[in-house]
């Protein structure tokens, strides 16, 4: 889910509007190389924690953070959401997040139910979970390929 072609494909979806609604202290789950960073509304952000376990993506993510002018507010957290000890080192604790942002990430977590419980626990009362997940393709060839694979939709 990397690169400009993927980002262009998101343009005509709800993703840009959803990301722009993220506010306050934000936990971005699986930011990858930072595809969503240009979509943030900087005036609504206090702090962003990008929880990204794939350290091979961190260099590109840092470049994108800098290019988007978010270096003062964006912190890469080099672990998965299940690593409570590492999250706590960064100040990510229960009832601490205003927004949790998850764009096309939850399909790849090892234990979805546990992950959702953990995310909910991290949100402040009245916080928001901003989420967009993959849907079954309307393209006939892609739909055929998807139907041959396990595809929760």
Where do the model's predicted regions map?
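Conserved alpha-helix/loop element of class I SAM-dependent methyltransferases that forms part
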Residues: 2-25, 33-39
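A short, aliphatic-rich alpha-helical micro-motif
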Residues: 19-20, 94, 116
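Local beta-strand N-terminus motif with an aromatic residue
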Residues: 23, 45, 94-98
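Class I SAM-dependent methyltransferase SAM/SAH-binding core
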Residues: 25-86
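A short acidic, Gly/Pro-enriched loop at the edge of an enzyme's catalytic core
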Residues: 82-100
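A short SAM/SAH-binding and catalytic strip from SAM-dependent methyltransferases
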Residues: 97-112
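A short glycine-rich, Lys/Arg-flanked "PGG" loop and its adjoining helix->strand segment in the class I
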Residues: 113-128
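Conserved class I S-adenosyl-L-methionine
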Residues: 128-152
């Amino acid at each position: 889910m990397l690169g400009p072609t993927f980002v262009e494909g998101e343009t005509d979806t709800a993703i840009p509007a959803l990301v722009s609604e993220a506010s306050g202290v934000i936990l971005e789950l699986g930011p990858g190389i930072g595809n969503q960073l240009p979509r943030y509304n900087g005036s609504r952000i206090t702090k962003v924690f990008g929880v990204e376990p794939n350290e091979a993506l961190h260099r590109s993510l840092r470049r994108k953070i800098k290019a988007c002018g978010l270096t003062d507010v964006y912190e890469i957290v080099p672990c998965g959401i299940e690593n409570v000890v590492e999250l706590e080192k960064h100040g990510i604790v229960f009832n601490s997040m205003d927004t949790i942002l998850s764009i096309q990430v939850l399909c790849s977590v090892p234990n979805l139910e546990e992950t959702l419980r953990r995310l909910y626990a991290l949100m402040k009362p009245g916080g928001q979970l901003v989420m967009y997940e993959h849907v079954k393709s309307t393209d006939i060839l892609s739909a055929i390929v998807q139907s041959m694979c396990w595809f929760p939709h």
